[in-house]
Amino acid sequence: GYIGKHLSNYLTEKGGHRIIPLGRSMFREGMSGHLIQTLTHCDVIINLAGAPINKRWTPEYKQELFNSRIVVTHRIIRALNAVKTKPKLMISASAVGYYPPEVEADEYTRTRGDGFLSDLCYAWEKEAKHCPQPTRLVITRFGVVLSPDGGAMQQMLRPLQATKVATALSLIHI
């Protein structure tokens, strides 16, 4: 995905780390042996799995959003339970959709929102919390990703690109 690609490049180029990206095929039923073998020698697991939320949320797509997060996380946890030497750290993604929209939230906010997105984030985090000891678990709640080469920025600029206003518009990234 978008964040994973940029994070992998950064960790490889700047940090000198060896990255083993796991594609969606790794999490299909019947792949658990291969997943266990892959995770056996990992020091850190970074779980950024999840289908994009910027599509129409039909009942079928809601199921895809669920499966791509909770089912994948469940399979990672199941594989980690099977490896002999546990990784030191697992970082598991979630989203600010966990919080109610009217609340100014920070890392200490425990209030959960209502609706599908909040329920999805809650279930995703709940599954990640089954991470086996002694692996330390860190859950990150991402917001909207802005970048000049992708993320939400490109989608927000599309309507402006068709108008002459776009040439006179200045954007400031803070």
List PLM regions with ranges:
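N-terminal Rossmann-fold NAD(P) dinucleotide-binding loop
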Residues: G4-K5
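NAD(P)H-binding glycine-rich loop region in Rossmannoid oxidoreductase-like domains
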Residues: M26-R75
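SDR active-site strand-loop-helix element
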Residues: I45-A49, M90-V96, T140-F142
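Short-chain dehydrogenase/reductase
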Residues: F66-I70, R110-E125, L146
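Conserved Rossmann-fold NAD(P)-dependent oxidoreductase catalytic core, especially the SDR/UDP-sugar
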Residues: H74-G115
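Conserved beta-loop-beta element that borders a ligand/cofactor-binding pocket
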Residues: S94, K126-P148
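A short C-terminal helix-loop "cap" of Rossmann-like NAD(P)-dependent dehydrogenase/epimerase domains
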Residues: M156-L169
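Conserved small/polar residues in nucleotide/adenosyl-binding loops
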Residues: I172-I174
